Amino acid sequence: MSIQTDDFSAADLPPVKRVMSAAPASPHEEAIERALRPKLFDEYVGQAKVREQLEIFIGAAKKRSEALDHVLLFGPPGLGKTTLSHIIAHELGVNLRQTSGPVLEKPKDLAALLTNLEKNDVLFIDEIHRLSPVVEEILYPALEDYQIDIMIGEGPAARSIKLDLQPFTLVGATTRAGMLTNPLRDRFGIVARLEFYTAEELGRIVRRSASLLNAPMDEEGGFEIARRSRGTPRIANRLLRRVRDYADVKGTGQITLDIANKALAMLDVDPQGFDVMDRKLLEAVIHRFDGGPVGLDNIAASIGEERDTIEDVIEPYLIQQGYLQRTPRGRIATLAAYRHLGVAPPVSGNDMFT
């Protein structure tokens, strides 16, 4: 199988604002992501522990002809929460209905989805932490008893009726598990945290995507893309497409180590997978705030970025790689951050260097 990208023309589409962002950049990119998305566990790479658990739970549900327990997937953006929801539905052999927390503004929005589910279907709610309290209240009896209460009529004549639902599985995805209310979190029978991918795992993903995109690539070129992708498949696939463009225009079309290095340098992606925004954040903490501790609001104002974007997209990888520390008093730059920027660390005055 191969994917022809003629149908994904970038004409009249806004450019990707930040190539290393783990958030989907545009409907155009989302369309390509869907085309590259694995549909079954046999095609899925990484998250070995989560995959093993889900395969067992799905197999048991199919054996008993029951709906799978409700599933909560959480972790940084771009790690495959949406992909896993599609795989769960495909492996169960059922329909998938997809929505997001911000879209479900009123109880009737959720009720319309729930009443149209068939037996054992999967309902995927992305950004489930952003459900409004009134919608969340409707969800509780649906998750526990497969029933919802809806109001008929208005004013004094209004009355509540109970509707039975088909058994279904809710798959909720969030980058902020801590923002879920306890009652909602407790209703998920399966909770799985997605971790950043290794360079080897991303290398396998890049090779698979290159094959689907008909992009000739050698092993060294593919691994260089993978190793700079911040442990995130979405970023790996985005970098692959940009390097392929460079190879087509500046080379022979073959993605080699040399082509990958030149293309990534053009994109301002350094060997650690950091881009301009990562370096701006580290430079701000070190130069403007003496290495920290500094609060997130001050960092956001300093680099001109949204607080939520810093917390959800930029800093998780910096923390995971040991360049930034999150403390009760604020963010602190580590020795690795000073070395990466070629800045001499302070001799004294910072707790982490004592």
UniProtKB/Swiss-Prot annotation:
Region named Large ATPase domain (RuvB-L): 5-197
Its subcellular locations are: Cytoplasm
**So what does this thing catalyse?**
ATP + H2O = ADP + phosphate + H(+)
Region annotated Head domain (RuvB-H) sits at 271-354
Is Nucleotide-binding one of the keywords? yes
Q: Which residues bind DNA?
A: 307, 326, 331
Which SUPFAM superfamilies does the UniProt record give? P-loop containing nucleoside triphosphate hydrolases, Winged helix' DNA-binding domain
Matching InterPro entries, A to Z? Answer: AAA+_ATPase (IPR003593), AAA_lid_4 (IPR041445), DNA_helicase_Holl-junc_RuvB (IPR004605), P-loop_NTPase (IPR027417), RuvB-like_N (IPR008824), RuvB_C (IPR008823), WH-like_DNA-bd_sf (IPR036388), WH_DNA-bd_sf (IPR036390)
Q: Name one Pfam family in it.
A: RuvB_C
Top EC class of this enzyme? hydrolase
**Which residues of the sequence carry a binding annotation for Mg(2+)?**
82
What is the similarity comment for this entry? Belongs to the RuvB family.
Assembly and binders = Homohexamer. Forms an RuvA(8)-RuvB(12)-Holliday junction (HJ) complex. HJ DNA is sandwiched between 2 RuvA tetramers; dsDNA enters through RuvA and exits via RuvB. An RuvB hexamer assembles on each DNA strand where it exits the tetramer. Each RuvB hexamer is contacted by two RuvA subunits (via domain III) on 2 adjacent RuvB subunits; this complex drives branch migration. In the full resolvosome a probable DNA-RuvA(4)-RuvB(12)-RuvC(2) complex forms which resolves the HJ.
Task: State the protein's purpose.
Answer: The RuvA-RuvB-RuvC complex processes Holliday junction (HJ) DNA during genetic recombination and DNA repair, while the RuvA-RuvB complex plays an important role in the rescue of blocked DNA replication forks via replication fork reversal (RFR). RuvA specifically binds to HJ cruciform DNA, conferring on it an open structure. The RuvB hexamer acts as an ATP-dependent pump, pulling dsDNA into and through the RuvAB complex. RuvB forms 2 homohexamers on either side of HJ DNA bound by 1 or 2 RuvA tetramers; 4 subunits per hexamer contact DNA at a time.
Regarding domains, what does the record say? Has 3 domains, the large (RuvB-L) and small ATPase (RuvB-S) domains and the C-terminal head (RuvB-H) domain. The head domain binds DNA, while the ATPase domains jointly bind ATP, ADP or are empty depending on the state of the subunit in the translocation cycle. During a single DNA translocation step the structure of each domain remains the same, but their relative positions change.
The name under which this protein is listed is Holliday junction branch migration complex subunit RuvB
